[in-house]
């Protein structure tokens, strides 16, 4: 469908030129969740909104705005048609069929009612639209102005047509209260917004409350120049390096991968470096805020893990609809953040979720608030910077995408992970291309801020000289379109202020010094430009630093100034002064003392409460209940460094107390012995590698332990005590972690306070109390961030402190988790408290009208408990353990029972008041020991003035085992684990109602997850697979190129897997390949990583199109694939699409010959979206057929093994429906999704074991077996310490897993079938 455009005069940022609007329709197969909810409402005869509609029909609606008119010359119309076809190809149109066409399944006539909707065309493009536009720009498209994906649904109406009340329901359920817009015919014919511009406020918001709080904590005028964070921090100068309040923990095993292909002989090294933990708490926080803040502390930091936490008001309201609306808002906001992080290539390893009732203190006025923590690695030399001075260049990294409704459900404007991944890659490459100090400025404001605030933070003195021709393209284009009447100094100043300086954005700003010196033949700007080009990162050299204050703009639009000329003298066309910092007068903060009505030590009358009813309420509360709707739908393991992520046990339940992130995945020999000569591989065979017995060496993995502690409601009740309790929780969460030295534990506090309630003295008192407490705990302390509620208004009394622990750790055996291990063992509890209900506890919130003051335990008792349990863990006595926190003792015990799927019998003394004892939240620990060790444990604890209690016994394993509590002779609770799991998972189920289709939520298979039974027997030997941990020098005869597409991260696991298999691995970026001989020296090609684009299928097809657009890159890859001496492997969504798109897998044909263009339309397969409609991070069984031709999987034929599977589109949909049978007969099926059994025929057909329910094929190989593409990612689990759960058949192994053989087999094959040479 086409509409003729017309010339119009539109406001700034609107496209008013001639254009054609094309509508394409795609049969979606089923309505989305919102459309289903609406249809159920309208079809309910009991509802006042009932319409008696006919069957619901829904489809995708693609709108494409193309430059020009139908009267343009034929060549222009042909090029426009080509670009429109390119859009269709990127979205799945192929030669065998079109997913998008001009014919709609709906017809708005007669009694048919049709409703079209989607993102607002009069607002900035959605994130999905901006990303596809970025792909089109890289592919050279010039006629496509904007693309948006909307929806269209309809039905036949048998009664009257929809009225105002029905339209209200549509607006609420489908349009998310006008977050999306209804599309009327011809609505955008008069113009639309093409640019990403968003008008900021008339003046930048300087956030005086936030600035004041930061000055109190980190120094400034409001604090009288005192830096409390530095005065009160507790660190060891012998073990730490610090910059101000920032504490760096050293490491000697930091993986460093060479980024230049010209590096020879070695591509990997273990270097000295530092680990830094950062974080912040922000209301309505941008999803990836910390990913930009961290470079503001250390510009070359490499994020290796992150953590997320949320605070929400409890979903309450006058009716069910209001509560459902609140739950939906929370579900979509948390999902948007989780998926942004899932696409960033940095795993999320820890988190929390807390709701506070609006009737409670701290709950009133609470805005959605997010904590985002990040663990970063920094190479030693990357800490060096230069002194700030005049004459330095100002650089802006990343596409200019001002914020607009980032957190408004359904979050179409959420941040782009692609943009942030490109910036991080560019900085990493820049540090390698120019390994000398050159960055002079990188500071950022403490919270989300306007561009002008970023520039103010960057400039400690003087000002900036900025050039209009070097501003972002959208801003520059808007200036160029200004008429003569407005193109004056004041007019341009107003435009630049509105559309560049005052909006908030996602860019990273730095200043760099450039002198005459060159490194590797490049100046600083040349190296930075090359790094950005290789990373696919947009960058702008905006101007230079000057002595003249403010922002001085030069109008060089008519004759652009080059970067070399920026240091010359120029007269400003207009100047913008930095906004003045508002000086706040003396205020009278609301006192933080406990209200007079608070009872300090209440006595509860609880005869009307039963343990069962209380436990049901506690377990189903969002603060305690399962967070599987978050944990299983964000990236948990990318990069391969994660040894402990949130999921534990056979059911992958999110119950881990701590995370463990390894610093290196590359193997070393015990005792620091040098690696064996690479010629060792000449004597190896697959049989030797498979049948070899493990060497028995004690393999040690070093890394960082991460935990979180927060007590938001208790902090609101009492700032000092709540802060101490958060510190206690963070410390006890680390009690069972493999920490090297308790004295190396670093506690970092992140403050979220309202200056109108907590003045300078109150903040100082709380920080001083925290410092004293840390000193008593015997741990180090620093302050990471200080933030305040968004408005700084007294209407919101919410305050919180999040404590994070980071500590060097090392392990060589199984990690201690809450998973109960052994039938007949005993459970021991040790607590620091009096057994009464803790003030601010969840029990008190739910069952008492009295808010009592919380009390933290004495530091000495907590220190003794932590160190005693650490000693027991190191001695090997502890089998499992869990901390006592939200929900109290009984919740801790239930969670341990669920994690291990084992029955538990608890015995409470007759004399005790068991109900307060069960729900008291006094900090403590519960751990499992064998009966023979109980005496030793009790003696050890009592010798340190602790009073442990033996609570009960662990029973048999199974979902129908019982959790039982006995009070003397009376059984006060007896429930099956299956029932308790349902109660504990009920909150996640509520959230899933908003996130997943009804057919999935109601499926009988939706809970069929976990209990993976593995069968790993090699047909080569008939023995269980125990691959040898063979550590050799990199073999120059087997060089493997890891191809890194623009916008991707997380390649480290592939690099490590091949390096551990003795190969010489290097990263290769698209822009490095300049001739078709580039890959001639390589025998292996690996494709993987995580692409930051929201649409995984689009990213894969666009990547193939980008390869085809570069003849040198395309021919080099095709030449490589056609060589008989090479192998390739593609892992994950992106890798499978690229290898299939290049013709290497998915059909019985050979790849095209070099010089032949790759036809993206001819791809034999496309990726099918997950049945849940969500990103999935699952630990699933994968079976390898006994007849597969794959050379890499030869040693694993006939095995069933669990593996990590992550992505949004985890199914294969063939364009030729008969192709799966053809491939099966040709032995080109590499693997299948498998059930929880070991029988070869028991393939998984249903979600979640089969994420898409589209067939069961999970991997393919070429006809000769040289090329392999897998949706799962074995590089993430080559070592047993990377596994989510080890099936009992493997015992307690500590070495490499059977998946290692896959990479070793590639090395052996290349030596025997290739043409290796040194």
Curated annotation (Swiss-Prot):
It comes from the Viruses. Its main location: virion. The keyword Zinc-finger does not apply. One of its GO terms (molecular function) is phosphoribosylformylglycinamidine synthase activity. GO terms for cellular component: host cell; host cell nucleus; viral tegument. Keywords: Host nucleus, Host-virus interaction, Late protein, Virion, Virion tegument. The keyword Plastid does not apply. Pfam families: AIRS_C, GATase_5, Tegument_dsDNA. Interacts with host DAXX; this interaction disrupts the chromatin remodeling complex ATRX:DAXX and thus allows viral transcription. Interacts with host SMC6; this interaction targets SMC5-SMC6 complex for proteasomal degradation. PANTHER family: PHOSPHORIBOSYLFORMYLGLYCINAMIDINE SYNTHASE. Belongs to the herpesviridae MTP family. Tegument protein that plays a role in the inhibition of host intrinsic defenses to promote viral early gene activation. Interacts with host DAXX and thereby disrupts the complex between DAXX and ATRX. Suppresses the DAXX-ATRX dependent deposition of histone H3.3 on viral chromatin allowing viral transcription. Targets also host SMC5/6 for proteasomal degradation in a CUL7 and calpain-dependent manner to support nuclear membrane-less replication compartment formation and lytic virus replication. NCBIfam families: tegu_FGAM_synt (TIGR01739). This is Major tegument protein. It comes from Epstein-Barr virus (strain GD1).
């Amino acid at each position: 469908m086409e509409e003729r455009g017309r010339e119009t005069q539109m406001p700034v940022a609107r496209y008013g030129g001639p254009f054609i609007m094309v509508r394409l329709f795609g049969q979606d197969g089923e309505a989305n969740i919102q459309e289903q909810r609406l249809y159920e409402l309208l079809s309910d005869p009991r509802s006042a909104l009932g319409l008696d509609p006919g069957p619901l029909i829904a489809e995708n609606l693609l709108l494409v705005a193309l430059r020009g008119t139908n009267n343009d010359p034929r060549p222009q119309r042909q090029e426009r048609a080509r670009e429109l076809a390119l859009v269709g190809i990127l979205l799945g149109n192929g030669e065998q069929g079109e997913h998008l066409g001009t014919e709609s399944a709906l017809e708005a006539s007669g009694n048919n009612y049709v409703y079209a909707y989607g993102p607002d065309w009069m607002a900035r493009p959605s994130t999905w639209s901006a990303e596809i536009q970025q792909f089109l720009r890289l592919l050279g498209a010039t006629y496509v102005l904007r693309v948006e994906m909307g929806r269209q649904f309809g039905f036949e109406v048998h009664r009257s047509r929809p009225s105002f009340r029905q339209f209200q329901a549509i607006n609420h359920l489908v349009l998310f209260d006008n977050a999306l817009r209804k599309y009327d015919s011809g609505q955008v014919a008069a113009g639309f917004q093409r640019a990403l511009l968003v008008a900021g406020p008339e003046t930048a918001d300087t956030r005086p409350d936030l600035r004041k709080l930061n000055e109190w904590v980190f120094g400034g005028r409001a604090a009288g120049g005192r830096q409390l964070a530095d005065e009160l921090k507790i660190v060891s100068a012998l073990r730490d390096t610090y910059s101000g309040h920032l504490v760096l923990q050293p490491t000697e095993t930091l993986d460093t991968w060479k980024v230049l292909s010209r590096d020879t002989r070695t591509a990997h090294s273990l270097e000295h470096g530092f680990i830094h933990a950062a974080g912040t708490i922000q209301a309505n926080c941008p999803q990836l805020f910390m990913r930009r803040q961290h470079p503001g502390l250390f510009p070359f930091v490499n994020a290796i893990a992150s953590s997320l936490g949320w605070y929400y008001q409890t979903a309450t309201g006058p009716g069910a609809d209001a509560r459902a609306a609140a739950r939906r808002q929370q579900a979509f906001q948390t999902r948007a953040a989780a998926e942004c992080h899932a696409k960033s290539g940095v795993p999320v390893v820890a988190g929390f979720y807390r709701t506070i009732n609006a009737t409670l203190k701290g709950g009133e006025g609470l805005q959605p608030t997010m904590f985002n923590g990040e663990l970063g690695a920094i190479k030693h030399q990357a800490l060096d910077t230069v002194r700030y001075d005049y004459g330095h260049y100002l650089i802006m990294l990343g596409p200019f995408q001002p914020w607009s409704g980032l957190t408004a459900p359904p979050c179409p404007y959420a941040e782009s992970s692609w943009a942030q991944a490109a910036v991080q890659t560019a900085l990493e490459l820049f540090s390698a291309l120019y390994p000398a100090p050159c960055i002079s400025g990188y500071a950022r404001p403490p919270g989300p801020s306007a561009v002008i605030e970023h520039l103010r933070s960057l400039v400690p003195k003087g000002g900036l000289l900025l050039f209009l021709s070097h501003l972002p393209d959208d801003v520059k284009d808007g200036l160029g379109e200004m008429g003569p009447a407005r193109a004056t100094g004041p007019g341009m100043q107003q435009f630049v202020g509105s559309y560049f300086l005052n909006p908030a954005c996602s860019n990273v700003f730095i200043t760099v010094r450039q002198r005459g010196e060159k490194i590797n033949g490049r100046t600083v700007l040349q190296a930075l430009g090359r790094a950005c080009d290789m990373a696919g990162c947009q960058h702008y050299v905006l101007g230079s630093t000057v002595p003249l204050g403010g922002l001085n703009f030069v109008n060089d639009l008519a004759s652009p100034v080059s970067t070399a000329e920026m240091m010359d003298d120029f007269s400003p066309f207009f100047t913008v002064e930095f906004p003045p910092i508002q000086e706040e007068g003396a205020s009278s903060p609301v006192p933080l003392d406990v209200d007079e009505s608070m009872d300090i030590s209440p006595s509860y009358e609880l005869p009307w409460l039963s343990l069962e009813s209380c436990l049901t309420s506690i377990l189903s509360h969002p603060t305690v209940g399962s967070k599987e709707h978050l944990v299983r739908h964000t990236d948990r393991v990318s990069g391969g460094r994660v040894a402990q992520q949130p999921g534990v046990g056979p059911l992958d339940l999110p119950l881990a107390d701590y995370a463990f992130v390894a610093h290196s995945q590359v193997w070393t020999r015990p005792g620091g012995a040098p690696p064996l000569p690479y010629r060792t591989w000449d004597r190896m065979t697959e049989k030797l590698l498979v049948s070899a017995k493990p060497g028995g060496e004690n393999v040690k993995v070093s890394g960082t332990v991460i935990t979180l502690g927060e007590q938001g409601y208790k902090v609101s009740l009492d700032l000092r005590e709540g802060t101490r309790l958060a510190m206690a929780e963070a410390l006890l969460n680390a009690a069972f972690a493999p920490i090297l030295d308790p004295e190396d534990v670093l506690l970092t506090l992140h403050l979220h306070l309202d200056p109108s309630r907590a003045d300078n003295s109150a903040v100082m008192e709380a920080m001083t109390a925290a410092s004293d407490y840390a000193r008593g705990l015997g741990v180090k302390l620093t302050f990471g961030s200080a933030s305040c509620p968004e408005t700084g208004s007294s209407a919101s009394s919410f305050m919180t402190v999040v404590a994070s622990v980071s500590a060097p750790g090392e392990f060589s055996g199984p990690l201690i988790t809450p998973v109960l291990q052994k039938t007949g063992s005993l459970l021991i509890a040790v607590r620091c408290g009096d057994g009464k209900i803790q003030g601010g506890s969840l029990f008190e919130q739910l069952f008492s009208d009295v808010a009592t003051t919380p009390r933290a335990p004495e530091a000495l008792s907590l220190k003794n408990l932590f160190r005693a349990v650490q000693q027991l863990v190191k001695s090997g006595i502890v089998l499992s353990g869990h901390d006592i926190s939200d929900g109290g003792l009984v919740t801790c015990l239930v969670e341990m029972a669920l994690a291990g799927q084992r029955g538990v019998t608890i015995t409470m003394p007759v004399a005790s008041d068991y109900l307060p004892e069960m729900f008291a939240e006094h900090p403590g620990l519960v751990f499992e020991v064998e009966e023979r060790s109980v005496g030793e444990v009790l003696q050890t604890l009592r010798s340190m003035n602790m009073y442990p209690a033996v609570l009960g016994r662990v029973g048999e394993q199974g979902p129908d085992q019982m959790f039982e509590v006995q009070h003397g002779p009376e059984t006060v609770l007896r429930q099956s684990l299956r029932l308790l799991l349902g109660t504990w998972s009920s909150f996640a189920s509520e959230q899933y109602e908003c996130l997943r289709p009804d057919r999935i939520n109601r499926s009988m298979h939706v809970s069929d997850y976990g209990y993976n039974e593995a069968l790993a027997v090699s047909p080569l030997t008939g023995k269980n697979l125990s691959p040898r941990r063979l550590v050799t020098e990199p073999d120059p005869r087997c060089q493997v190129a890891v191809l890194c597409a623009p916008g991707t991260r997380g390649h480290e696991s592939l690099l490590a897997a091949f390096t551990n298999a003795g190969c010489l691995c290097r990263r290769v970026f698209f822009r490095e390949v300049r001739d078709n001989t580039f890959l001639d020296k390589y025998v292996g090609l690996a494709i993987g990583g995580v692409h930051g684009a929201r649409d995984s299928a689009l990213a894969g097809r666009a990547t193939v199109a980008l390869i085809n657009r570069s003849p040198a890159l395309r021919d080099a890859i095709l030449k490589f694939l056609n060589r008989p001496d090479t192998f390739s492997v593609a892992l994950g969504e992106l890798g499978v699409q690229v290898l299939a798109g290049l013709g290497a897998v998915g059909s019985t044909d050979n790849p095209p010959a070099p010089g032949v263009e790759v036809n993206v339309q001819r791809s034999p397969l496309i990726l099918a979206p997950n049945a849940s409609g969500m990103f999935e991070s699952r630990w699933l069984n994968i079976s390898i057929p006994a007849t597969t031709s794959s050379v890499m999987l030869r040693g694993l034929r006939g095995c069933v093994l669990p593996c990590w599977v992550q992505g949004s589109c985890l199914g294969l949909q063939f364009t030729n429906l008969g192709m799966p049978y053809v491939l099966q007969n040709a032995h080109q099926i590499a693997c299948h999704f498998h059930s929880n059994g070991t029988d070869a025929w028991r393939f998984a057909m249903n979600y979640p074991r089969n994420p898409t329910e589209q067939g069961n094929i999970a991997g393919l190989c070429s006809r000769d077996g040289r090329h392999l593409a897998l949706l799962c990612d074995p590089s993430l689990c080559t070592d047993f310490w990377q596994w989510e759960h080890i099936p009992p058949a493997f015992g307690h192994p500590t070495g490499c897993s059977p998946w290692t053989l896959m990479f070793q087999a590639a090395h052996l094959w290349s030596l025997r079938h290739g043409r290796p040479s040194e």
